[in-house]
């Protein structure tokens, strides 16, 4: 279950626990009052701390969401927020760079020249610092934005990256359903995503590369059979010529990404490198382009 710090109280935590919820994810974003004010959040740093402490009274499985790349956020402010999440007992931490959405106050401020666009180099440095702090504290990075102590990886997150169907309940919630030939995402009664089999295969490769374990040679071969119309056998790393088609070669795409240092191949799997995660748009875009 997800909650914001300003709405989470100790009695609510007890009630949620009694209902059978086994994990709480808190949208903290920062433990710095100035940064929270810039974001326009309804909670302050002390409320965030209180929410994490309240959650830990009942839940062992507590996750904290943090953001980097926020205007006015110093490197030390962000690093201290990561350290504080660990100190408060979170066993799962997700770190996201600020995304400027169209028609938002930040977007308007940038258009007026009142604010600079997020610095991608600064965001990358912040993500690397978060990784260092969390790994030193015993966390491991199991997917692009999330770190967990062993046994506390999010099954919810993993379901997205492994193509598991899901049901969304409530306003703006998204449902994903699929069969062998079609994948659809539906929001508020409207189809917002409708993929054919080739696009599904490309998306599965892209989603798989959001996880540390990446994708196996067997997964790549199966995707190639669908995307390039090439039936392949076994799970070995096949020659690029076997996958060539007018739409591009699946294995050639991975080889190109490897040449760029964005992926690596070992032990029968293709995995993203740290550089690949930092350059996610290039990595994911190349795989999605296999079946536009």
Where in this protein do the model-derived segments appear?
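C-terminal scaffold of the Radical SAM
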Residues: 2-244, 292
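Solvent-exposed, charged/polar functional surfaces in cytosolic regulatory/catalytic domains
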Residues: 133, 256, 286
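Mobile late-domain/C-terminal helix-loop "cap" segments
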Residues: 246-248, 268
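Basic amphipathic alpha-helical segments that dock to polyanions
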Residues: 249-260
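A short, conserved structural fragment
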Residues: 258-268
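Minor-groove-contacting beta-hairpin "wing" of winged helix-turn-helix DNA-binding domains
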Residues: 269-273
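Short, amphipathic alpha-helical interaction segments positioned at domain boundaries
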Residues: 275-292
């Amino acid at each position: 279950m997800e909650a914001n710090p300003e709405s989470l109280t100790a009695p609510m935590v007890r009630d949620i626990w009694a209902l059978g919820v086994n994990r709480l994810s808190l949208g903290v974003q920062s433990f710095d009052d100035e940064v929270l004010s810039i974001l326009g959040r309804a909670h302050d740093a002390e409320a965030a701390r209180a929410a994490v402490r309240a959650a830990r009274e009942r839940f062992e499985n507590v996750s904290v969401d943090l953001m980097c790349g926020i205007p006015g956020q110093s490197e030390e402010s962000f690093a201290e927020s990561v350290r504080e999440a660990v100190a408060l007992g979170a066993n799962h931490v997700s770190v996201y760079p600020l995304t400027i959405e169209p028609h938002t106050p930040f977007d308007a401020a940038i258009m007026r020249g009142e604010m600079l666009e997020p610095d991608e180099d600064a965001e990358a440095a912040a993500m690397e610092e978060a990784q260092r702090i969390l790994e030193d504290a015993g966390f491991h990075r199991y997917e692009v934005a999330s770190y967990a102590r062993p046994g506390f990886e999010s099954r919810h997150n993993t379901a997205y990256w492994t193509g598991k169907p899901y049901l969304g309940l409530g306003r703006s919630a998204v449902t994903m359903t699929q069969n062998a030939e079609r994948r659809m995402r539906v929001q508020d009664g409207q189809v917002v995503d409708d993929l054919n089999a080739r696009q599904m295969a490309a998306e599965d490769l892209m989603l798989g590369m959001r996880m540390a374990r990446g994708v196996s040679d067997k997964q790549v071969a199966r995707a190639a059979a669908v995307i390039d119309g090439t039936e392949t056998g076994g799970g070995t790393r096949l020659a690029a010529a076997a996958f060539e088609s007018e739409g591009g070669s699946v294995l050639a795409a991975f080889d190109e990404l490897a040449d760029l240092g964005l992926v690596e191949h070992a032990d029968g799997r293709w995995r993203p490198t740290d550089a690949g995660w930092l350059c996610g748009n290039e990595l994911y875009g190349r795989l999605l382009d296999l079946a536009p």
